[in-house]
Amino acid sequence: VVLDSALRTGARINARYAADPKALIGSATETADNTFDLFVAIPAPSASSAGSAPGSAALSGPYWAVTLEFPGGVTANARNTQFSLSPAAAGRLADFSVMGHAANIAQGLPQTQQMTGATYTLNADGTGTASFGTAAATQLISGSKNLYVSADGNVVIGGSVTTGSHDFLIAVKAVSGVTNATWNNKFWGAGLRVDPNAVTGYSGSMAAGGAAKVYWTKREKAMGAGVFDFTGINGYSLNADGSGTMELTQVGLGAGGKAFVGSAINRSDTAAYEIFFGVQLPALSGSGVFLSPLGVVNAASSAPPGNPISPGQFITLYGTGLAKSTQTAAPPYPATLNGVTVLVNNKQAPLYFVSPGQINALVPYTTQGTTATIVVQNGSVNSNTVTVPLAATAPGVYSLDQSGSGPGAILHADFGLVNAGRPAAPGETVLIYLTGMGAVAPAVADGTAGGSNPLNKSVADVVVLVAGQPATLLYNGLAPGFPGLYQINVTLPTLLSGGGNLPLAIQTNNAYHDQVDIPIR
């Protein structure tokens, strides 16, 4: 969803809509100015559902709440918190402990603050206020906040309207009996982050598989870096009450596991201040030949919806009724396979694999623009049209287990597999296999393999990082003999301490991909 900003003329919000719980979230990631934002909207309750008295059912906690504040509009006063918000008696909030940090308190180290005597009011339309005592720069949270409760009571948003205040509060109704496996769905996500390197607003999606790690796709707008696409993985650990950690952030899972909030509170990240919010993706289905609007993904990384496609990239399409049966093609890949054709911006895409629920195709090299339309033709029947972002590159490294994470598809120089049984050594040359590196020179025909003399090199510049250290680039282009498969040869950094599975990231001018590891001895 693209929305015109109500606050800035000409700014457009890169937004996402969720149906359960209902919310509209996003950030103005495509604007060229130096304004960075987070947008959250929720449906207001009717008078009959909200009630008119404090303590009504519209605010029935507990809730996991996070805040991001910039008192006076300056980062020197920045503060980030997480706490449990729960109504007690009419008009009173239960006493609670605030976890957080502030730039002007203890050098930004995490602190706790005991909150007693907090009160609230709630009106029939879901609006209200919460008072956390007299406003004070020495407190993690204080003063009065306006509150807005969603129609179903699952989400609360708010902030202060006092002159000079710049803050955001987001809360989700807490759940109980949580384990790591509870976080098992796909979500829209958006956030705002301030750290010494940049100010960043982002909008995207996240997939949690219940196995203590989540996959992120983010379109980010960062000060000094412009707009770029991030795909990566974060580990997490949840407590029984839904609170927990995700890498260097604190999170709270709520709304029956269908929404989450987060804030940057960690001793290892004391200069970062961030707030983010996620809501479950809607369930989409259709009749006949149906291509899921959420089902166009990078064939290597399987990054969540919203990640761009790029010219020459292997993509996977998910839906129903896409083909009458399963069939696989041999190179050069044809434009029609088993009666199925895929059109990308009205141009036929080479097909490797078709089945009723999945298609693997190559994006034509001539695909241009900022978005692309995709249509599946099964015989004489066309699917719905799906529009997806398009970028010069959208790197995704293949993984050994085909999940998009864990040990990557990486070979030693003798073409032996890099794995736990035969890890790579610091300073060794390795071969990395991926897709999504965009245009090559000399060009090749759609669906055909790259050659060996001459090699078809990627036009895009690339940096390979191992545990954050740059590797020495030797080759970046198509893997000879395999359509749509790219290969990057690097010499690993010589100073890789610790060994084990180290993160391997791919950085281009418009993208940063960080989902796989490389075993190092």
Question: Which residue stretches match the model-derived regions?
Answer:
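Mature soluble binding/inhibitory domains
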Residues: 1-292
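A sequence-level detector for low-complexity, Ser/Thr- and acidic-rich stretches
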Residues: 62-66, 70-80, 84, 105-106, ...
